Design a protein with these regions (language model features):
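Segments forming oxygen-rich coordination pockets for charged ligands
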Residues: 1-152
Length: 152
């Protein structure tokens, strides 16, 4: 795996090392967007980053929100778009919209759930991570849960 393919692993390692970590994941895009849904950015409690959710155009704003999430332990959904004055101020001028889920590891994103994702990835087992934004319910989904998504 390249370093951009090991973002969950990096977030888990930072969390376990005691520096804290948050995981930011693109959960939706509309129009022209630099990164597709599923792209991730790991942010350490010290401000180190690995990965990308926007090709650099909103990473700074996402890092600020991730550090706040580490302080308050709460997840958040961030939205940036060209109709949003904030989008231009943080650099998203590509003509699209992007929606990003930020979760502090060990808080709303349980360490054992992230560890299960890392283990499945290492074993090359198909897996999806599902989050219901209303109520913040989380679960791992496999081929039996999403047969059309995980075809042979």
């Amino acid at each position: 795996m390249s370093e951009h393919d090991s973002i969950p692993e990096t977030a888990l390692a930072w969390h376990r090392a005691g520096t804290g970590a948050a995981l930011a994941t693109v959960i939706g895009t509309w129009g022209s967007a630099p990164r597709q849904a599923g792209s991730q950015l790991a942010i350490s409690g010290g401000g180190d980053i690995m990965g990308s959710v926007s090709g650099g155009c909103v990473e700074g704003a996402v890092v600020v929100e991730a550090l706040e999430a580490l302080k308050d332990g709460l997840p958040r959904v961030l939205e940036y778009g060209v109709s949003d004055d904030d989008a231009f101020s943080v650099g998203l001028a590509c003509g699209g919209e992007i929606r990003i889920l930020v979760e502090p590891v060990g808080g709303t994103l349980p360490e054992d759930l992230l560890a299960a994702i890392v283990t499945a990835r290492a074993a090359r087992q198909p897996l999806a991570y599902g989050v219901t934004l209303e109520g913040w319910h989380r679960r791992l989904l496999g081929p039996a849960d999403l047969p059309a998504r995980f075809r042979d």
